[in-house]
Amino acid sequence: LDSASIVYGNNGDDSEKRGIIVSERTELIQAGNCIGSPVYFFFNLNTAHLTDASQMLNLDELARVAKKYGLSLRVTGAADSSTGTPVLNGSLSTLRADHIVAELEKRGIPIERIVKVSRGGIADHVPVEANRHTKVELFF
């Protein structure tokens, strides 16, 4: 992992090289080469407010590891499809992803290393409350 931070790190001022690196990261993320298990952050009904503020500790650790090893992150927002309309759930899933992205940026993760996805309303998990989440995955 230490060599990954050198290969993919943003050590120079060459903007063309940075563009290539960002492109390579995007390709790796799209290829699905996730490191470890995803981390889920759960939200209250119809809000972008976490169900429990202690979840921020997970964000602290994700940011620490991502910075240490020069990793990229995919942040995927979702809402439960059993409430709201497709349009509202699409907006809510975006707000939830935006919230987590903003918190990662506050912790020193450059926006160039974050890919944001919004899934809208989903029904993937039981109980239904489990669909009110944002998932964060780490990638080389």
Describe the function of each predicted region:
Residues 53, 78-140:
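Periplasmic OmpA-like peptidoglycan-binding domain that tethers envelope proteins to the cell wall
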Residues 1-73, 130, 139-140:
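Periplasmic peptidoglycan-binding/tethering modules of Gram-negative envelope proteins
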